[in-house]
UniProtKB/Swiss-Prot annotation:
It comes from Methanocorpusculum labreanum (strain ATCC 43576 / DSM 4855 / Z). This is Small ribosomal subunit protein uS4. InterPro entries: Ribosomal_uS4 (IPR022801), Ribosomal_uS4_arc (IPR022802), Ribosomal_uS4_CS (IPR018079), Ribosomal_uS4_euk/arc (IPR005710), Ribosomal_uS4_N (IPR001912), S4_RNA-bd (IPR002942), S4_RNA-bd_sf (IPR036986). Belongs to the universal ribosomal protein uS4 family. The gene is rps4. Pfam families: S4.
Amino acid sequence: MGYPGKNTKQYSSPKRRFEKSRIESERVLAITYGLRNKREIWRATEVLRKHRSGAREVLAMTSSIGEAPKTIARRDELVGTLQRYGLLGPDAAMDNILSLKVEDILERRLQTIVYRKGLARSPKQARQLITHGHIAINGQRVSVPSYMVSIAEEAGIMYYATSSLGDEANGERQRIMNQRA
């Protein structure tokens, strides 16, 4: 365990900083998902990288030692985690983990789900509503746009009870509803 006051990087920057195709694809992702900067994409890439490496480890353990209890437990843990977040279906295999994309991770962020549910007019506005404390999950205020929403929590996303947007007569809420209609 490290020093608690010293935060560590949760992402790794790309090896080729000025690769045109990567920069263009990151720009499209940043616009589509309303991300603040490229580090958010790199963080999602790092999460995906960890899941993929875990899947490769399990596949390697399966091929070398077979279906040992430790291998089965690790596989079930990995698949269960990804199923809980809605990244894999109920009958998913280990190969499905290797085929996940960064977009799949970005789709499970609170910011994206708030926008997709129609609680905001744009991904940028969804981010602003979250950081200003207008969004709650199951009645609990959440102010982190990058929060990974599980399938169980998705139905509980709504405006915070004491928020000004909690009132249906609010002007901004009316504009949001009119745009969706």
